[in-house]
Amino acid sequence: MERIKELRDLMSQSRTREILTKTTVDHMAIIKKYTSGRQEKNPALRMKWMMAMKYPITADKRIMEMIPERNEQGQTLWSKTNDAGSDRVMVSPLAVTWWNRNGPTTSTVHYPKVYKTYFEKVERLKHGTFGPVHFRNQVKIRRRVDINPGHADLSAKEAQDVIMEVVFPNEVGARILTSESQLTITKEKKEELQDCKIAPLMVAYMLERELVRKTRFLPVAGGTSSVYIEVLHLTQGTCWEQMYTPGGEVRNDDVDQSLIIAARNIVRRATVSADPLASLLEMCHSTQIGGIRMVDILRQNPTEEQAVDICKAAMGLRISSSFSFGGFTFKRTNGSSVKKEEEVLTGNLQTLKIKVHEGYEEFTMVGRRATAILRKATRRLIQLIVSGRDEQSIAEAIIVAMVFSQEDCMIKAVRGDLNFVNRANQRLNPMHQLLRHFQKDAKVLFQNWGIEPIDNVMGMIGILPDMTPSAEMSLRGVRVSKMGVDEYSSTERVVQPHRSRAECSFLL
């Protein structure tokens, strides 16, 4: 308040006003700052003062034949004086209005074809249903998501060749259209865009949107397919969410879904064959999804799912180092371990053979309703920071992390026999046996885990064995965060192809 008063007093003195309005800016550093380089330093200001001028626009001289000097109200549309430094004409913003109202019209037949992605988006929104709005704490996780619905899955290079061939067919330069989808799209687009009057550069931009998958690393709670991402700003805030059902599907989401289903079926069938790797590769090569060979889709599609990763690894493609356990995606962000087989005794004196991971490791755990950061050593949970939608979701994440830690107190908490089977009536492996057991009832596990006093840390709270929050005590090593925990970012480590192939046969 004081500062404002002081400024008011200063401005009331005529000398101040004179200094501010009449003094020239002649400090070299300032002049340099605003005049070096082609980049506009203050676009908003520039636009403001340009529009305050009578003729802020320059146009080609031909405009003088196409637009009258004055409009119906007698306002001048262009000035006879040339623009300094070029032979262009100075034009008023009113000329734009005149042109929009009275200028030549052209055929609009190509607009829906070129701006196809926008027209389709409008249709999806028109037929979508919104509401109701719920107010609750939103746990958002940054995930890599697809942001332009309705695209084909070409690589940037493939799309570039198609665009050059469609938009600039007479330009020089080698263009090799090899894949089937490239040839089909090129033929289709050339026919669609015959005699198109829309600026070629605009057509090229719009084609890029249609052909290439664009992904961003965004905080999301809920649906991650592209038709949900396009309305992210309407469906979730910091403390609210709005229900939304999209008004239509798009090809890329269908392909992602079909790819996961196909990969799972292939992996399942390959597992029981005499040569799993060979049969998996053969099936990948002979399968088509939406008329495109599955191997071509696998090369371009970034979908991260266990079965899809196995197929990619078998083909020698790079895969990210993530795996699933108990409905959570685990990504190792630090550390390393070696596997050793050990025999352990449960609380029911049943012997289990488990593969123990020896070494210090850090993971991010990402599930549908909860996320966590886990730090562990050999058969010991060091720290678990978990965040979730509700008590139930947080409990699920804690159980999975406790089982994954392979701690002795977890194995000793088993009551009764472990004899869970899968759908094919085969016994589950020991780690999944333990998980199923505690997912049914985790009371003993939580009671036996132990509790510890906690420090007061901003945004963190403790959780007791009965899953109630506490500011004083918490399950040993476990804390609940009020903020979401991010999925590992795009800079994640990637498993090299030569290694992934070997891992793949082991996974099968």
From Swiss-Prot:
Its main location: host cell. It comes from the Viruses. The keyword Cell membrane does not apply. It is found in: Host mitochondrion; Host cytoplasm, Host cytosol. Keywords: Host cytoplasm, Host mitochondrion. GO terms for cellular component: host cell cytosol; host cell mitochondrion. May participate in the inhibition of type I interferon induction through inhibition of the host mitochondrial antiviral signaling protein MAVS. The knockout of PB2-S1 has no detectable effects on laboratory infected mice. This is PB2-S1. The gene is PB2.
